[in-house]
Amino acid sequence: KRVGFGNTDIGHQVDNFWLVGPLKITPEQEVKFAYQLATKSLPFDAAVQQQVKEMLYIERRGDAKLYAKSGWASDVSPQVGWYTGWVEQPNGKITAFTLNMEMKEGDDATERKQLTLDVLDKLGIFFYLR
């Protein structure tokens, strides 16, 4: 509750509340949380936030770094998948993002990342080498 993550209702399942619990979060809230984590401005020790950041590191393109996390809520209809994170530029600029999409079948899982990379590339934020 102290971070204000979504509706802050984690219910009783502490190991997967973000997938099957009562927790609800908007894309705007996801982006805000990702930005706060990227800038270590959440109400947690900065060293802990740095450890989480390191766990979310995906790849580097040039000097830009991509950090992200995917997820798939399968207990709702329609099922929802997301790819949320941020790009860190060498000058320290942070661009947080989230992609939420309806999930249907197997290929949708890989499409989340590719769609996000395509948009970040087109916006000139993270050039993806194909």
How should each PLM-predicted stretch be described?
Residues 1-39:
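Mid-domain, small-residue-enriched loop/turn segments at the edges of structured enzyme/sensor domains
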Residues 33-130:
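Structured C-terminal helix/loop/strand segments within mature extracytoplasmic catalytic/sensor domains
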